[in-house]
C-alpha cells in the first residue's frame, strides 16, 4: 500500500485503524505499533496533511528505533579515506571486462527509474539488487564494514586471486544473458567500491544523486528496512 495504493480519508479501514488498532497497540509499542503509525502517516500524506504526516512518521520511528553504530560506520569510511590512494590501483590485475555496471547511491534517488531506462536497451540487462559482490567479499574473509580489512584487500590481493574473484562475480551476474552490459543495482555496493575497482578496473560505476533534501525527506517517509 505504501508504493501502489492510495488511502482515502473516508476509508473504513483507516477509521478502524484510528479507533481500535492504534489505541490497542500504543501501550505495547514496538514494530506493530510503528507499522500502524506508518500506515496512518501514509493516509495523511495522501490527504495532503504533510505536517501531520511528518509528526506521525516521527512517532513511528520513536516507537521502533533502528540500532545503528554511527561511530563504527564513520571509522569504516575514514579508514579508507586515510589509507587508500590512486597508487593502490596502478597495478590492478583483475579482469578487464566492461560488462558489469554498478548503480549505487541513496534509496529514493531515482536508481530504479534509471535501471529500467537502461535495461530497455537491447544490449543491456539487469540482475536487480544482486548480493554477488557482498558475498564475494565475504569469501575473502573480509569482515562486514571493517575498514582495515577493506584496505588490506585492496592493497594485498594477489593477481591470481583478483582474476578469480572478478571472473566469479562476472559469471554470477551474467547468468544466461549475452548482453554487453549487465546492471547490478544493489545500492549498498557503494561500501564495496574500493574492492570492486581493484578486481574490475574497467567496469562502470553510476552514482545516483538527487537533491539531498528531497532524498532525505523521501527516505524518512518510507518504511525502509534496517539494512538501509
Placement of each model-derived feature along the sequence:
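Alpha-helical solenoid repeat scaffolds of the TPR/TPR-like class and their adjacent stem/linker regions
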Residues: 1-176
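PAPS-dependent sulfotransferase catalytic domain
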Residues: 127, 132-158, 176-228
